[in-house]
């Protein structure tokens, strides 16, 4: 499968398929930064809690136009009652944790998966570890000696545990694997793995214009 994206806040009348993609995870793990980085190729230098407006991007997939709807959610407990309203009609969840935050990693299985499976039991999940640039920075352990980082093997184990269809590590600040996150989200919706051949599924490359 090949895909190219033309980011636009206006839906195309020629779009044949709509995919609603919702980001979920603890507060301050970088969900909003991920969306801003993907749609504008910029990185906000200051933390601002969930100010990303719902955004539509027209994506060309194998010659057909797909309208990708991106929804941001707030991870703080104050939003526990209103957050599930965003789950209605979701086609895929991007479930994010920070690679430099053990609590956000542990909350994936403790809090977020139970919540998603309660409100949207059949919607596929793409597990995403954010802030890989900090995790891989040799100065980080020196600057934050008490921090407990998460490594790829742990992320893959969590993916298997929760039944996510993919695991990707990314850095919004460094623009590393940002596009790959959303490419994967599109793929799991358009080409869901069969129950018998899930592990044999081959995934093509996507290209952004």
Curated annotation (Swiss-Prot):
Mode of membrane association: Peripheral membrane protein
Motif (Effector region): 47-55
Modified residues (Cysteine methyl ester): 206
Keywords on record: Cytoplasm, GTP-binding, Lipoprotein, Membrane, Methylation, Nucleotide-binding, Prenylation
Signal peptide limits: none
UniProt GO BP: autophagy; small GTPase-mediated signal transduction
PROSITE patterns with a match to the protein in the record: RHO (PS51420)
Principal subcellular localization: cytoplasm
Binding residue positions for GTP: 25-32, 72-76, 130-133
Entry GO MF terms: GTP binding; GTPase activity
Propeptide: 207-209
Keyword Membrane in record: yes
Pfam hit, one: Ras
UniProt cross-references to CDD domains, sorted A to Z: Rop_like
GO cellular component, one term: autophagosome membrane
Lipid attachment points (S-geranylgeranyl cysteine): 206
Domain of life: Eukaryota
Subunit structure: Interacts with SPK1.
Annotated PANTHER family: RHO FAMILY GTPASE
Record-stated family: Belongs to the small GTPase superfamily. Rho family.
NCBIfam families: small_GTP
Function: Inactive GDP-bound Rho GTPases reside in the cytosol, are found in a complex with Rho GDP-dissociation inhibitors (Rho GDIs), and are released from the GDI protein in order to translocate to membranes upon activation.
Protein name (database record): Rac-like GTP-binding protein ARAC9
Origin species: Arabidopsis thaliana
């Amino acid at each position: 499968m090949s895909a190219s994206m033309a980011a636009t806040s206006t839906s195309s009348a020629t779009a044949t398929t709509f995919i609603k993609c919702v980001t979920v995870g603890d507060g301050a793990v970088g969900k909003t930064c991920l969306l801003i980085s993907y749609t504008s190729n910029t990185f906000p230098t200051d933390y601002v809690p969930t100010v990303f407006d719902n955004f539509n991007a027209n994506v060309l997939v194998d010659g057909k136009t797909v309208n990708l709807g991106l929804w941001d959610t707030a991870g703080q407990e104050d939003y526990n009652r209103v957050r599930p309203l965003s789950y209605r009609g979701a086609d895929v969840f991007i479930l994010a944790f920070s690679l430099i935050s053990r609590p956000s990693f542990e909350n994936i299985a403790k809090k977020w998966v139970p919540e998603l499976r309660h409100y949207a039991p059949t919607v596929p999940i793409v597990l995403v570890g954010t802030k890989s640039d900090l995790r891989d920075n040799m100065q980080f352990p020196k600057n934050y000696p008490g921090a407990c980082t998460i490594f790829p093997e742990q992320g893959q184990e969590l993916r298997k545990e929760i039944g996510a269809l993919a695991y990707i590590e990314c850095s919004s600040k460094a623009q590393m694997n940002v596009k790959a996150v959303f490419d994967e989200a599109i793929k799991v919706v358009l080409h869901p793995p069969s129950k018998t051949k899930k592990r044999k599924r081959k995934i093509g490359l996507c290209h952004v214009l």
